[in-house]
Regions:
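Alpha-helical metal-binding/catalytic segments enriched in His/Glu/Asp
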Residues: 51-52
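Extended beta-strand/beta-hairpin segments
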Residues: 1-46, 57-103
Length: 103
């Protein structure tokens, strides 16, 4: 999988992947970002939750279970002093509502 990220202005970047869709990316305001896109850590968590949701839907569907609702929330603990500001723990809270299709 290839993704290309190009700087547009100062902390503002735009990423494009194989799907051709553009993803605006910007830094947090405290380092000079101006709200022109998603902050990279937030984008990471969107990706994690999206992957979990898609794979969960696929697995349940293959087992004959119909999903009415899938919801994934993320949270994390992060070292905020110094650099890099690494995540030390990532939490996923998954809520699924399903019903089993009769045989």
């Amino acid at each position: 999988m290839k993704v290309k990220v190009v700087q547009k202005e100062d902390f503002h970047f735009v990423g494009t992947g194989e799907s051709g869709r553009e993803v605006p990316i910007d830094a947090a305001g405290y380092v000079g970002g101006k709200g022109r896109g998603i902050r990279p850590p937030e984008l990471l968590f969107h990706s994690i939750a999206g992957c979990v949701g898609i794979h969960l839907y696929e697995a349940l569907h293959k087992e004959g279970k119909h999903t009415e609702h899938i919801e994934i929330e993320t949270d994390a603990e992060r070292i905020t002093e110094g650099y890099p500001k690494v995540f030390t723990k990532i939490y996923l809270y998954v809520k699924v509502v399903v019903f089993i299709i009769g045989k």
